[in-house]
Amino acid sequence: MATPLIELCDIRKAYGGVDTPRVEVLRGISLRVHAGEFVAIVGASGSGKSTLMNILGCLDRPSAGSYRFAGKDVAELDSDELAWLRREAFGFVFQGYHLIPSGSAQENVEMPAIYAGTPAAERQARASALLGRLGLASRTANRPHQLSGGQQQRVSIARALMNGGHIILADEPTGALDSHSGAEVMALLDELASQGHVIILITHDREVAARAHRVIEIRDGLVISDSAADQPPAHAHKGIQAEELRQRLDRGATQHGAWKGELLESLQAAWRVMWINRFRTALTLLGIIIGVASVVVMLAVGEGSKRQVMAQMAAFGSNILYLNGSPPTLREPAGRITLDDVAAIGELPQVKHIMPVLGEKMMVRHGNNSQQFYVGGNNTFFPEIFNWPAVEGSFFTETDEASSAAVAVIGQKVREKMLAPGSNPIGQYLLIGNVPFQVVGILAGKGASSGDQDSDGRIVVPFSAAAIRLFGHRDPDYIAIAARDSGQVKDTEAAIDRLLRQRHQGKHDFELTNDAALIQAEARTQNSLSLMLGAIAAISLLVGGIGVMNIMLMTVRERTREIGIRMATGARQRDILRQFLSEAIMLSMVGGLTGIALALVVGASLTLADIAVAFALPAIVGAFACAVITGVVFGFMPARKAARLDPVKALTSE
């Protein structure tokens, strides 16, 4: 005799134990089902018939006994092989229909084929054909809530047939239907049986059971009667045989669909779920959007500030060295740089220009207006050393320096604050301290060189005039030195160091720095500031990630039955994992892109408000990548939880 498709031997199923009472639902069920049979399993509520169906459909495992499918011991099959059986061999028709609420009739029917890796065009054509065959051609786009009970059950039957449905497991298929719809469903099952499908009908209604060719009655977990025929049904040869199913199982369980197609399907399904729950999705996205926007804007502001400061510092020249006496210590007095040192340094071949500087903030008055500004005594090399010319009038001359003339060149901010708008500044007088100085020139605008120091708020006077008329001494505060070659700043620094050690009897009582080093130090400071801003903003992205995890955990709880339905139609654990992980990633991707768009809008607004902003592509890409990684990290736990759900418990959850 041919190998039976299904063979149960002394199957037992018990629940509870350890801390709860042990209840044995099935107590030694033995039966065989051959190709082409239409079997009705009938029994009262609580007799164990639904538990038996779950075991037959590989949704549950027995506590004891042997279950062989097409000659293979089901206990030896792994989770992927069991999923293959649910997907390719079995087709489930449930009393409660068990359709995905967010999917259309077409999408519900296509589901088993998606998990089988069937190309989109092929499965869409087959799903449409099945729905048309069952009288639902005009309802393919309708969601379950838009269908009657009978229509939903026909969608469920079409889904069961999608991958062939060689064995239809129908659990009380007419239980929730009116008599007319119930009769239509039974007529469909009769038709399928005549075509060679194995039909296993679970029911408590003996009238419904009488439609089957074979009736098995169970009571209290035991088979009490079985009207098995001696000969197989006449149409048994039309159905698939055990040997063919076994060969297909051996081949198919190790085959996987194209990962690109599977990923695309998961992302499309994720988008549908997000769109259906738009309001909740928007609330969830807020955390990611704010996080990404904060990171991008903070880094852009930091980068803009850095570039602005670097440009302003570089505007003074990168070949400048600064020399001043070392500060006093407990053992040594403060170092002192004299004008003789200045003259000696000026003789070095590496030095292009040298300038002693005397300066401090002083009260400046003009008419009734008085304010404090930095007043510096410099020589005529000031414009060349600092690349800072006079744009109106002229800079003071060597003659002015030699005669200690009371003339001044003022910055743009001094002009703005002290002189009347529209007036000619050249020739006007400013009272610096108690000494009147005539304005002979206006410096070009420079802005802030670093921090909050505004270079345009300064007044430049001849060094000799500052020493005699304002400060009463000729010892410079520091020396500004322009190297002849900007590529030889280090060599120039070394030459000055050697010269001063010789002049100061070997003492290193001076400090020598260069603008290039200052610019590098400022760059490091600005980078640290940018990193700090980015780290602060990243915290909001982390909070957004936690929000994604929370919503995904809630989604898993809400969609537990959907997960069970997907497993019943052949989804493997990795399919469920990919599905929910795709939703988390989709959330993060949409949130990331929206956050970047928001950041660009905010950046444009800041630019209009004269705040320096510089968007960097690596920062934008990095923020987006972090958002996606956040989705993966925080979405993995909920997705893993969903993938590990028990199919039976998931199906029966509320």
UniProtKB/Swiss-Prot annotation:
It comes from Pseudomonas putida (strain ATCC 47054 / DSM 6125 / CFBP 8728 / NCIMB 11950 / KT2440). PROSITE patterns: ABC_TRANSPORTER_1 (PS00211), ABC_TRANSPORTER_2 (PS50893), MACB (PS51267). Has a basal ATPase activity that is stimulated by PvdR. In vitro, interaction with PVD influences the affinity of PvdT to PvdR. GO terms for cellular component: plasma membrane. This is Pyoverdine export ATP-binding/permease protein PvdT. The keyword Signal does not apply. One of its GO terms (biological process) is response to antibiotic. It is found in: Cell inner membrane. The chain crosses the membrane at residues 282-302, 529-549, 584-604, 614-634. GO terms for molecular function: ATP binding; ATP hydrolysis activity; transmembrane transporter activity. Part of the tripartite efflux system PvdRT-OpmQ, which is composed of an inner membrane component with both ATPase and permease domains, PvdT, a periplasmic membrane fusion protein, PvdR, and an outer membrane component, OpmQ. The lineage of its organism: Bacteria, Pseudomonadati, Pseudomonadota, Gammaproteobacteria, Pseudomonadales. Residues 6-245 form the ABC transporter domain.
